[in-house]
């Protein structure tokens, strides 16, 4: 199937986009990557890589020209600490990116367009209990996302639906549930919970200070999906004959306290949890994968333990370099 197909991955300098480029190249696609920045941790193997600001219409026209398919991953986003404090910027920037990229794809005759949405579209009123009922795709309505990031994702889902209905572009919509793995943001405020926990545990191990800070009581729940499963699922959905939103995540829920213990077990270190005030997001969130299994005949297979075992050593190495640099004598 990939022979002769040319694809665009927007957000190709970011965590999921970078891994997706590598996955698609391994399958034989010709890939153009576009982002505001190059990948931070390893070079992209895209056939072409362009540094473009996709908030600008003319850049979106350039990025989507001469291609068959678009994987739309570009977004201004981060972990809960970031999205809870930057509502206006997120709504403004992501609205421009998605409006312009989708319309430019239509203008340039792109045949198929996959939009990466998020579990943040689900209403807050369905996620008030840590022992949350797994979220089905139809649970997004009546709409009440917790934050601007979720609202923008939901509106962009509708935009894709109407572009398919009105203009005939074949759209696909995937809702991510907490994707993690190596070569992703691990510090600076935009990192997600698994990367943040790996960083904190690594710092505890390398400095000898066992205290690990956790926002809130740590009993908020989430499910976490490893990056290799994520990019495989994205490609399977692009090839499937299905245009409604589809969850992509693990359906095993853990508390943040449990996540901390799991990372500590991988690191081989005893930690002391210190609960502090901080943004916690919704109380509970988990993916219902019933429709995913029906549509793709597949679901994520890599366990949380295995994913953490693949992720933690990479982050520990980077934390170690940072600790060493901080302890080096100044001249």
Language model: regions and residue ranges:
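Rossmann-fold cofactor-recognition segment
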Residues: 44-57
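Short-chain dehydrogenase/reductase
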Residues: 91, 95, 145-157, 187-195, ...
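Conserved Rossmann-fold NAD(P)-dependent oxidoreductase catalytic core, especially the SDR/UDP-sugar
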Residues: 99-146
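Flexible, glycine-rich beta-alpha linker
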Residues: 121-123, 172-194, 221
């Amino acid at each position: 199937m990939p022979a002769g197909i040319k694809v665009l991955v927007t957000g190709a300098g970011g965590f999921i986009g970078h891994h997706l480029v590598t996955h698609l190249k391994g399958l034989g696609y010709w890939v153009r990557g576009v982002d505001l920045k190059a990948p931070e941790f390893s070079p992209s193997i895209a056939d072409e890589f362009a540094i473009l600001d996709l908030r600008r219409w003319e850049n979106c026209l350039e990025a989507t020209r001469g291609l068959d398919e678009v994987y739309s991953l570009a977004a201004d986003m981060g972990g809960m600490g970031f999205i809870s404090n930057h509502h206006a910027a997120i709504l403004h920037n992501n609205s421009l990116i998605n409006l312009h990229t989708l319309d430019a794809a239509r203008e340039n005759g792109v045949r198929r367009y996959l939009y990466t949405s998020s579990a943040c579209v689900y209403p807050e009123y369905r996620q008030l209990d840590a022992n949350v009922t797994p979220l089905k795709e139809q649970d997004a309505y009546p709409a009440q996302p917790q934050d601007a990031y979720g609202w923008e994702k939901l509106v962009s889902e509708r935009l894709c639906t109407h572009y398919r209905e009105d203009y005939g572009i074949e759209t696909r919509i995937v809702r991510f549930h907490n994707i993690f793995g190596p070569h992703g943001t691990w510090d600076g405020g935009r990192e997600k919970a698994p990367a943040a926990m790996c960083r904190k545990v690594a710092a505890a191990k390398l400095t000898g200070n066992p205290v690990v800070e956790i926002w809130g009581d740590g009993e908020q729940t989430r499910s976490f999906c490893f990056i290799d499963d994520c990019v495989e699922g994205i490609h399977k959905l692009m090839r499937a004959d299905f245009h409604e939103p589809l969850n992509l995540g693990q359906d095993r829920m853990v508390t943040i306290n449990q996540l901390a213990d799991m990372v500590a077990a991988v690191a081989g270190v005893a930690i002391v949890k210190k609960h502090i005030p901080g943004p916690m997001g919704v109380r509970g969130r988990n993916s219902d994968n019933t429709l995913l299994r029906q549509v793709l005949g597949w679901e994520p297979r890599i366990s949380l333990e295995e994913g953490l075992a693949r992720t933690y050593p990479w982050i520990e190495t980077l934390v170690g370099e940072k600790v060493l640099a901080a302890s080096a004598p100044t001249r």
